[in-house]
């Protein structure tokens, strides 16, 4: 599948599930001195994740252009790039992590028709301040991911970009 087709199918799937498509924000963030570039899909949405009302509603979907330089030494291996597009579906207080996992699973298994036995998941493994994300692990197991295909890692934690701000554990999907 080519990238254009994947983008289109992702946006269409979430539109079908009552999400509004929003445009990719600028690669140079407005009014944010903490970063040089937009580094993640959620970066332009931080004010809305903090409670500000988004003009398009509480369910959003986008394909955000991103540039990262923090791990520039690793660019060129099999997993790191400087520029990439991040597919994102966003619930601004509309649905919970369990529903987000269900949407992700349905998209990759039913829409993309990926082999579920080749899906691997990473979850936040916990640290001294925040415990392991057992909730995400539970939802992935309920969706049908085998226990031995779920890995807890320490760096599955987003933000904050500065001293404070939205942050928390994340989960990622891999295919091999």
Positions of the model-derived regions?
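Structured aminoacyl-transfer and RNA-binding surfaces used for tRNA recognition/handling
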Residues: 1-176
């Amino acid at each position: 599948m080519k990238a254009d087709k994947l983008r289109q199918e992702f946006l269409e799937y979430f539109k079908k599930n009552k999400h509004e498509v929003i445009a990719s924000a600028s690669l140079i963030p407005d009014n944010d001195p903490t970063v040089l570039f937009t580094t993640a899909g959620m970066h332009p949405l931080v004010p809305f994740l903090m409670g500000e009302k988004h003009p398009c509603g509480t369910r959003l979907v986008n394909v955000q252009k991103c540039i990262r330089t923090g791990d520039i030494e690793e660019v060129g291996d099999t997993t790191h790039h400087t520029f990439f597009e991040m597919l994102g579906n966003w619930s601004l207080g509309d649905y919970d992590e369990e529903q987000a996992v269900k949407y992700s699973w349905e998209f990759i298994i039913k829409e993309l028709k990926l082999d579920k036995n080749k899906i691997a998941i990473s979850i936040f493994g916990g640290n001294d301040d925040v415990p392991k994300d057992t909730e995400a692990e539970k939802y992935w197991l309920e969706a049908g991911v085998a226990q031995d295909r779920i890995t807890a890692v320490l760096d599955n934690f987003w933000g904050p970009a500065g001293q404070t701000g939205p942050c928390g554990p994340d989960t990622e999907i891999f295919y091999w």
